[in-house]
Regions:
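AMP-forming adenylation/ATP pyrophosphatase catalytic core
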Residues: 2-220
């Protein structure tokens, strides 16, 4: 490779990096105006804001949201993301699944949450990353014979029987809550997730869950 060609390639790389950085800033600006995110691991996106944004920017934000909330290591194919976004923005579909998430359209909002039950993450018996989405730990100690797995609707029923509730998002659909982590001893729920506020389960056990996907929704 000649020195001149190497210089041209270097200049091209620098230019592309700058263009990508500018796109990332625009995605972050759109997210600030269009995205409402809950620490329970679901999001709402303003349809008017997405429709008014440049298509490449709207696509990036939607793809980032699906990837983070779906919890999968690899993002869904871009052509599938584009098709899904076109369908819900146009109103062709009001509900679809993509990348481990459920996307619904209601009035002027898209809602995105984890599709529980389609694929099951490995159960956790010690602190760590669960379902590619949440960092979890148990305080004040991890009870013997317990493991972290999906809350599910049975977990919600047991939690409500204990007079407990998941905070801080009282507006979350039950499908969102069912996709959260719960601490189980066989078929008995020991604790639901403590998210931003302490809500202990049996014997004061608290399952702390912090939404922390490998790649954040907002790029900066």
């Amino acid at each position: 490779m000649t020195e001149a060609r190497a210089n041209r390639l270097s200049e091209t790389g620098i230019r592309l990096a700058r263009e990508d950085a500018a796109l990332e800033i625009t995605v972050a600006e759109l997210a600030a105006n269009a995205l409402t995110f809950s620490p329970l691991g679901w999001a709402r996106i303003s349809i008017p804001s997405m429709a008014q944004a440049p298509s490449v920017i709207a696509l990036r934000l939607f793809a980032r949201t699906v990837h983070a909330i779906g919890g999968r290591e690899m993002p869904p194919r871009q052509d599938r993301v584009q098709a899904a976004l076109d369908q819900v923005l146009s109103g062709e579909k009001t509900k679809l699944t993509i990348g481990g998430t459920i996307v619904t359209r209601q009035q002027e909002w898209l809602s995105v949450w984890r599709e529980a039950g389609k694929t099951y993450p490995s159960n956790l018996e010690q602190p760590g990353k669960w379902d590619g989405r949440f960092d979890v730990l148990v305080e004040p100690f991890w009870p013997e014979g317990t493991e972290v797995r999906f809350m599910g609707y049975e977990g919600l029923r047991q939690m409500e029987t204990m007079g407990d509730r998941i905070l801080p998002d009282s507006t979350a659909p039950r499908a969102v809550l069912a996709a959260l982590p719960g601490l189980w001893n066989e078929n008995k729920l020991v604790a639901g997730p403590c998210i931003q506020t302490k809500s202990p389960g049996v014997d004061g056990i608290c399952l702390k869950a912090h939404f922390h996907p490998p790649r954040p929704i907002t790029p900066c």
